[in-house]
């Protein structure tokens, strides 16, 4: 499925979604796994 690596000032998180939560300073790197 599509997974996004969501980076913030608190660390890196992986979400099994097509995008990261908006409006919280996340950077998005998505890939198909």
UniProtKB/Swiss-Prot annotation:
Disulfide bonds join 6-30. GO terms for cellular component: extracellular region; nematocyst. Keywords: Disulfide bond, Ion channel impairing toxin, Nematocyst, Potassium channel impairing toxin, Secreted, Toxin, Voltage-gated potassium channel impairing toxin. Coiled coil: none annotated. InterPro entries: BDS_K_chnl_tox, Myo_ane_neurotoxin_sf. It comes from the Eukaryota. Signal peptide: none annotated. Its main location: secreted. Gene3D superfamilies: Anthopleurin-A (2.20.20.10). GO terms for molecular function: ion channel inhibitor activity; potassium channel regulator activity; toxin activity. It is found in: Secreted; Nematocyst. Potently and reversibly blocks mammalian Kv11/KCNH/ERG voltage-gated potassium channels. Acts as a gating-modifier toxin that shifts the voltage-dependence of ERG activation in the positive direction and suppresses its current amplitudes elicited by strong depolarizing pulses that maximally activate the channels. Belongs to the sea anemone type 3 (BDS) potassium channel toxin family. This is Toxin BcV. It comes from Bunodosoma caissarum (Sea anemone).
């Amino acid at each position: 499925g599509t997974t996004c690596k969501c980076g913030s000032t608190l660390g890196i998180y992986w979400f099994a979604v097509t995008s990261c939560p908006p409006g919280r300073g996340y950077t998005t790197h998505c890939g198909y796994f």
